[in-house]
Amino acid sequence: VLATAQRGVYKSDGNKGLSPERLQRFFLRGKGANAGYMRVKPELQKHMSFLPVNLVQELPLRDTFDVVFCRNVMIYFDAPTQRAVLERIHRVMRPGGTLFVGHAENFSDARNLFVLRGKTVYERL
């Protein structure tokens, strides 16, 4: 999964939920043998980082992040572990950053860390 994300090449049918404006702004459409695929524009890709981390340990990150995807992971942790993981993620995100989670995940007990902005989207406070 991380290797696919790092390459920045995705099947075009995987763009559900992206507006036409965002598709045009952030992606290039494949042509010829690459038809049916899209690639993240190089000027955006150079600002992207993908890292495997152990969420139950302190995160080995020096920079802060604008966006974190942590989808369908937290459901496997008990409530105290979820809270500890959210605190770790909170520390490595910039204020106003966006956290994407899975549909089954809800962090209503972490209102002092994140505010719900959509069904699966939280904003870091």
Locations of the language-model features?
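Extended basic-aromatic, gly/pro-enriched interface segments that bind polyanionic ligands
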Residues: 1-69, 73-81, 106-108
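Conserved beta-strand signature within the Rossmann-like core of class I S-adenosyl-L-methionine
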Residues: 95-103
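Generic structural signal for beta-strand residues in well-ordered domains
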Residues: 41-43, 92, 115
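Core SAM-dependent methyltransferase catalytic element
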Residues: 67, 108-125
